[in-house]
A protein has these predicted regions:
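ER/Golgi luminal nucleotide-sugar-dependent glycosyltransferases, focusing on the catalytic module
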Residues: 1-204
Length: 204
C-alpha cells in the first residue's frame, strides 16, 4: 500500500530481490495504481492483484491465498507473506533463508513480539507472543493443513488497524502453534530488544 498511489524505488528494489529467489511472486496492492506504475514491477512478478484498501495487509493476503486455492498452495515448498512496511533487503536474502532451513521449524519470521500480559491496546486480555507479520514464511506442512486455510477463509475483512493486529497478526502464530507447528524468529534478539528499549513498536 502507498498513500500516494505510487510504487517507490524501495518497493522496486524489494520486489526485484524477491524475484531472484522466489519461483513465483504475486504482487497485491491496496492502492489505486495506474498501469504506468504497475509496469515498474511487471518484469519481476508472476501476477498483479489490484484491490480496494479493505482489510489492510491481511485482507490483501487473504484475497491472494484464496485465489491460489488449496491445491495450488500445496504445490509450493514454502509461502512467504510480506509487506512493504520495512525496507528489504540490506543483506542477501539467501543467507537468511539458508540459516532458517537449518532449523527444525514449520514457520518463521524476521522478528518476534514478546508476550505482554496487558492486551488493552488490541482490546484483548493479553498480547500473545507472535511473529511480526511484515515478513513470515510457512513450509509445505503448514500449507497443507486445514488450520492454515481455515484461518484465511474465516477471518473477516477488518477495516480498523487495531482489529487487524488484535484478531489477525497477534493471533495467527498461536493458532498455528496450538495446532502443533513449530516456529522461530530469524532475529532471536527481537525477543528482548523491545523489552529492553521499552519500545514495542520495534522494528518500526
Amino acid at each position: 500500500y502507498d498513500k500516494k498511489n505510487v510504487i517507490s524505488e524501495e518497493d522496486i528494489t524489494s520486489v526485484c530481490a524477491y524475484s531472484k529467489i522466489f519461483d513465483a511472486l504475486v504482487f497485491v496492492t491496496n492502492s489505486d495504481l495506474k498501469n504506468s506504475e504497475l509496469e515498474k514491477i511487471k518484469p519481476y512478478v508472476s501476477k498483479c492483484i489490484c484491490r480496494e484498501n479493505k482489510g489492510l495487509d491481511f485482507g490483501a493476503w487473504k484475497e491472494a491465498i484464496l485465489l491460489l486455492g488449496r491445491e495450488k498452495l500445496t504445490e509450493y515448498d514454502e509461502l512467504v507473506l510480506c509487506n512493504n512496511s520495512c525496507f528489504a533487503p540490506i543483506f542477501p536474502l539467501e543467507k537468511m533463508f539458508y540459516e532458517m532451513e537449518q532449523e527444525n521449524v514449520d514457520f518463521w519470521g524476521n522478528c518476534i513480539f514478546p508476550y505482554l500480559p496487558d492486551g488493552s491496546y488490541i482490546h484483548k486480555d493479553c498480547i500473545p507472543e507472535h511473529l511480526q507479520s511484515y515478513f513470515t514464511v510457512y513450509n509445505k506442512r503448514v500449507l497443507s493443513s486445514n488450520v492454515f486455510l481455515k484461518f484465511w477463509e474465516e477471518i473477516p475483512v477488518y477495516e480498523n488497524y487495531i482489529d487487524v493486529v488484535g484478531n489477525c497478526e497477534s493471533q495467527f502464530t498461536k493458532i498455528l502453534a496450538d495446532a502443533g507447528f513449530i516456529y522461530s524468529p530469524y532475529v532471536k534478539e527481537s525477543y528482548y530488544i523491545c523489552q529492553y528499549l521499552q519500545n514495542y513498536s520495534v522494528p518500526y
